[in-house]
Amino acid sequence: MAYVKIFANLSDYERAEKSHYIKNDFYAEIERIANEKGIELPDTSWKIEIDVSGTITINGDITEENKEQIKNMISENFADDMWEKYIQTADISNTQYRLVNAYYEVEQFIQKATNGQYSFDDINVDDNGKITGLPEKMCKIMNSQEANAKYEEIRDNIYMLTDYKNQYGLEDILAFKAGYNISDSEVSTVGTSGNNSVMDNAGYYKNMKTII
């Protein structure tokens, strides 16, 4: 029981620490990079959304040109960090966390490794657990017993997501977004319409633990 309590306290501390950073320090970092790049940040309230595929959307009373500049800046400098801090402070279950974060990590890995030519949608897993649909060399490494730790992690995530997809589909995972509202030089996290829909039943969680 003592270990459980320590872990819970540590988890709460890390969540509070990240929440504090989001509220008090994130905007200063965004502003610093924007100034370096000569990008004007909006004076009015605006919003950043990052979906599980890594697509960034900027909303607010901003010109399309300015939206594109800010989107590119966020993509190049903050996207992964913003996703990580959001998902770690969001009010979601462990199962939801593992599913949506697994999808994000698989997508980012595949897109970066293939220069955006492939995505999770291209992946197939047969009854023997063999992964196909990606470039031949990548599939060979992914299916090898000698794959490095990163490839093993991606492979396990692919198995988990494929199992979930076969049981429930991916619509609920794809609807999840990391949302940030920026107003008066303050950043705060905001929920989006899809963030409460990821299935979280005991039966699936029990099965999930046996395949990862």
Regions inferred by a protein language model and the residue ranges of each:
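Type III/flagellar secretion export determinants
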Residues: 1-212
